[in-house]
């Protein structure tokens, strides 16, 4: 039996076949990106390329859907691809185990994506990816911060300018820096509510945000749904 049978009942068989042939790039497969990938795979998307340079860490277990104890230390791209294939063995999923930055953004274009999901944390890399996609006319949606939240209500998808006053540090920086680069109206997922706690110094001395399983997974599924809806 076709595992997508019930999905087709929602969107219709012809639109389903059309949209699932599209190519999606997911940049970062951690909390938000991993959940977005999960949604795309379970929906039935057939062609996905995932980018990440990191390995699964024990601290990922509280929120990242791809992480389990038996894959700690393994490349996230490998883990995510294996999970995708366990859901749909016929999926065409490519893995690129790199940190996306200005010098290798051509890798994105080479995939000829119909949509890019930006789920990376590095501000500079995020800015460069967004600028590149806007310049190359590649549709892209970016996730802003999902840390320091227990309550996962308040997530919306709108222009990045609408993040003003939401208390998210990443949103503020992205809003300011994108404006400097002449980019307006960038589609972003963000929360309209302020974070419930502040970043604290972790054991390694970094200013790290707290996290719970709810917000990043809700955010990732919202991003996946938005992309599918835009392509239908």
Each predicted region: which residue ranges?
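Conserved N-terminal Rossmann-fold NAD(P)-binding element of oxidoreductases
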Residues: 26-28, 51
């Amino acid at each position: 039996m076709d595992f997508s049978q019930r999905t087709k009942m929602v969107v219709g068989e012809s639109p389903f076949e059309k949209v699932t042939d599209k190519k999606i790039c997911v940049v970062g497969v951690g909390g938000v990106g991993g959940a977005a990938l999960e949604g795309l795979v379970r929906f039935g998307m057939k062609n996905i390329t995932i980018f990440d340079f990191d390995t699964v860490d024990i601290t990922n277990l509280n929120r990242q859907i791809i992480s389990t104890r038996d894959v700690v230390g393994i490349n996230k791209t490998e883990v995510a691809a294996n999970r995708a294939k366990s859901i749909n063995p016929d999926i065409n999923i490519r893995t690129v185990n790199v940190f996306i930055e200005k010098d290798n953004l051509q890798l994105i274009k080479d995939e000829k994506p119909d949509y890019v999901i930006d789920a990376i944390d590095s501000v500079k890399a995020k800015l460069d990816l967004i600028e590149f996609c806007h310049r190359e006319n590649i549709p892209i949606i970016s996730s802003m911060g999902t840390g320091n939240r227990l309550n996962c209500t308040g997530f919306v998808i709108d222009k990045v300018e609408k993040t003003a006053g939401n208390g998210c540090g990443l949103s503020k920086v992205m809003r300011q820096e994108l404006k400097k680069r002449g980019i307006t109206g960038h589609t972003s997922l963000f929360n309209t509510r302020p974070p419930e706690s502040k970043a604290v110094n972790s054991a390694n001395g970094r200013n790290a945000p707290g996290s719970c399983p709810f917000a990043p997974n809700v955010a990732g599924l919202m991003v996946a749904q938005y992309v599918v809806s835009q392509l239908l």
